[in-house]
């Protein structure tokens, strides 16, 4: 049975469970549940603190897990990223009092507060910057005002909290993060017979990602305009073209990027396409 770690709370939790549900896996109904078995898919879910998931997976206690890329790298364990999942996007950035810093090199000899000391130490070492890292469990933006640090390194989503604390971002992003599926480094599942289950899980999650990014578009077009229409709707490989009762017309079906739906519909209509319909994709295998 495949053993999977899932975030039990925070910004990762709800989105991870929703994605797994879309992929056809049973999920808990009560947030107090710590373990849940899905016998139909021969899989067991363990709901854990997001920060601990990489540790469990890295030690081989659990087969795979969903966590943030930032948390994976900060844990400094033998675990690797299998698949980016497209949600919980954020950046890990430096920030300091407005006007105090403009570039990373100015952090030499300074005190830096962070909740991601492993990730930060690695970044500073790579660049030869000597700074004192002060580890805090949260609310690091208050550390400068309280005299604990000169600047901070933290995960930033909107930046509003930093602005409210009188701070500004400087330097390039330390890391661009999002939710990721992880497994133990070098472990392909052969040791405990879960290789096939992991492959199926990845394929299902990839299907959800594609289904979220694309829609299915159907339309009718005159035969002589098919090539021009196909240039607008090339699909992932090629559009499906089917004959209609009127031999001068054909029906076309193609997957198109969801964010470009209305633009493509307008251009098809201007070209001469009619009966243009769009359908959601709930699941797919590419």
Swiss-Prot record:
Q: What is the originating organism of this protein?
A: Arthrobacter sp. (strain FB24)
Molecular function (GO) terms for this protein are:
ATP binding; ATP phosphoribosyltransferase activity; magnesium ion binding
Is NADP set as a keyword in this record? no
What PANTHER family does its record include?
ATP PHOSPHORIBOSYLTRANSFERASE, ATP PHOSPHORIBOSYLTRANSFERASE ATP-PRTASE
Which co-factors does it depend on?
Mg(2+)
Where would you say this protein principally sits, based on its record?
A: cytoplasm
Keywords of the record, alphabetical order, are: Amino-acid biosynthesis, ATP-binding, Cytoplasm, Glycosyltransferase, Histidine biosynthesis, Magnesium, Metal-binding, Nucleotide-binding, Transferase
Q: Which Pfam families does this entry report, sorted A to Z?
A: HisG, HisG_C
GO cellular-component term (any): cytoplasm
Annotated metabolic or biological route of this protein: Amino-acid biosynthesis; L-histidine biosynthesis; L-histidine from 5-phospho-alpha-D-ribose 1-diphosphate: step 1/9
Q: Where in the cell is it found?
A: Cytoplasm
- Recorded E.C. number(s)? 2.4.2.17
Q: Please name the InterPro entries in this protein's record.
A: ATP-PRT_HisG_long, ATP_PRibTrfase_cat, ATP_PRibTrfase_CS, ATP_PRibTrfase_HisG, HisG_C, N-reg_PII-like_a/b, N-reg_PII/ATP_PRibTrfase_C
Question: What protein am I looking at?
Answer: ATP phosphoribosyltransferase
Q: How is its activity regulated?
A: Feedback inhibited by histidine.
The family classification in the record reads:
Belongs to the ATP phosphoribosyltransferase family. Long subfamily.
**Designated gene of the protein:** hisG
Its BP terms in the Gene Ontology are: L-histidine biosynthetic process
Its lineage reads: Bacteria, Bacillati, Actinomycetota, Actinomycetes, Micrococcales
Give the function comment from the record.
Catalyzes the condensation of ATP and 5-phosphoribose 1-diphosphate to form N'-(5'-phosphoribosyl)-ATP (PR-ATP). Has a crucial role in the pathway because the rate of histidine biosynthesis seems to be controlled primarily by regulation of HisG enzymatic activity.
Reaction(s) catalysed by this chain, per the record, are: 1-(5-phospho-beta-D-ribosyl)-ATP + diphosphate = 5-phospho-alpha-D-ribose 1-diphosphate + ATP
């Amino acid at each position: 049975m495949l053993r999977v770690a899932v975030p039990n709370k925070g910004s990762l939790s709800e989105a991870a469970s929703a994605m797994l549900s879309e992929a056809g896996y049973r999920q808990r109904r009560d947030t107090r549940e710590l373990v849940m078995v899905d016998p139909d898919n021969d899989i067991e879910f363990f709901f854990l603190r997001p920060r601990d998931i990489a540790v469990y997976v890295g030690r081989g206690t659990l087969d795979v897990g969903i966590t943030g890329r930032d948390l994976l790298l900060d844990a400094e364990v033998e675990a690797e990223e299998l698949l980016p999942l497209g949600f919980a996007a954020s950046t890990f950035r430096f920030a300091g009092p407005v006007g105090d810093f403009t570039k990373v090199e100015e952090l030499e000899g300074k005190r830096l507060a962070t909740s991601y000391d492993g990730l930060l130490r690695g970044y500073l070492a790579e660049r030869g910057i000597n700074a004192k890292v002060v580890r805090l469990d949260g609310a690091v933006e208050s550390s400068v005002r309280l005299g604990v640090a000169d600047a901070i390194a933290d995960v930033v989503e909107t930046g509003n909290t930093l602005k409210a604390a009188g701070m500004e971002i400087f330097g390039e992003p330390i890391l661009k993060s999002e939710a990721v599926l992880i497994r133990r480094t070098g472990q392909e599942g052969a040791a405990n017979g879960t290789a096939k289950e992991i492959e199926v899980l990845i394929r299902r999650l990839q299907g959800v990602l594609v289904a979220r990014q694309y829609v299915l578009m159907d339309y009718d077009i005159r035969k002589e305009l098919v090539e021009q229409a196909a240039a607008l709707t090339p699909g992932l490989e090629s559009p499906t073209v089917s004959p209609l009762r009127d031999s001068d017309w054909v029906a076309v079906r193609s997957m198109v990027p969801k964010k470009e739906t209305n633009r493509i519909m307008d251009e098809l209509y201007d070209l001469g396409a009619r009966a243009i319909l769009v359908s959601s994709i709930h699941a797919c295998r590419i």
